[in-house]
């Protein structure tokens, strides 16, 4: 499985080789770079013609046995109910549902799974797994089942209620939501923009924050689950396709005050683990990723990346030397004045992240 926000890579981790994520495109292992890696082009499922033309019997005068009555064609309703071809091949979505039905854990991203032919939130989730694997059902099924295993073991929804260390994580990450109006239409998901913010300049001690690997990964997963709550796939009524998917989030990684010359083993280990966990279990959730306050040397590194990753992938990564220019990036959006809604620190006129944003619980 290829590995893909979703987000990650922590401060102190030096740029490394480009890695691939199932769902977020080819993401470089650079500070802040996490999933959300991969492949978005989906293969069309093979359509099996239920009726093959039969050769015409030769004409002669010998008596012939009565021909078997022709089988009636399924009605559209029957086809939808069975979600199969006459060859017995289930549709890609139905195959994923059949696999998920046999699992003990029935939830992904806060959504109780159900038949995707009748439950749009499940259709969205399953289609994301297909999109992350270029429409290859077996690969999507493998990733889906492993995600169910991981969620059963980790119980990430419970991390939303966990108390994290204020000394380690306060001010490190936020989730903000900006809408076209007070109550955007539920059938127009494009009228809502969800951001996750990773402020690595707020880290007081790399060893303290990243030293306990499990604790840091749990905090990062809690931030991701908060973002998913804001996207609200469970309330969606508009399905997605291989080419249309508005249920994604923008990720911002701010490195203001971080020295890229400082590299600690614990920070690199935390980055590596986050990339794996988020890439494996949160495919196709990245809309755009902005790397802010990046030193000039990192800008040079991104120039070199053009030699190794596709243009489609690069279009999602935006290294910027100054965070104050971020607001200018949001022109083509259905949320009017989105740039102005961002905090002043990022070129907008909105409230600061501590006032407006949501974050995992710290104490």
UniProtKB/Swiss-Prot annotation:
Compartments, record wording: Cytoplasm; Endoplasmic reticulum membrane; Microsome membrane
Residues reported in the UniProt entry to bind heme: 200, 220, 253, 255, 289
Catalytic activity reported: a 1,2-diacyl-sn-glycero-3-phospho-(1D-myo-inositol)(in) = a 1,2-diacyl-sn-glycero-3-phospho-(1D-myo-inositol)(out)
Low complexity biased stretches: 64-76
Topological type in the membrane: Peripheral membrane protein
GO molecular function, one term: phosphatidylinositol transfer activity
Cofactor(s) the protein requires to work: heme b
Record's compositionally biased regions (Basic and acidic residues): 36-46
Chief location of this protein within or outside the cell: cytoplasm
CDD domains for the chain: SEC14
Keywords: Cytoplasm, Endoplasmic reticulum, Heme, Iron, Lipid transport, Membrane, Metal-binding, Microsome, Transport
Region: Disordered, residue numbers: 1-84
Source taxon at top rank: Eukaryota
Assigned protein family: Belongs to the SFH5 family.
PANTHER family registered for this protein in UniProt: PHOSPHATIDYLINOSITOL TRANSFER PROTEIN SFH5
UniProt-recorded name of the protein: Phosphatidylinositol transfer protein sfh-5
UniProt source species: Neurospora crassa (strain ATCC 24698 / 74-OR23-1A / CBS 708.71 / DSM 1257 / FGSC 987)
Lineage: Eukaryota, Fungi, Dikarya, Ascomycota, Pezizomycotina
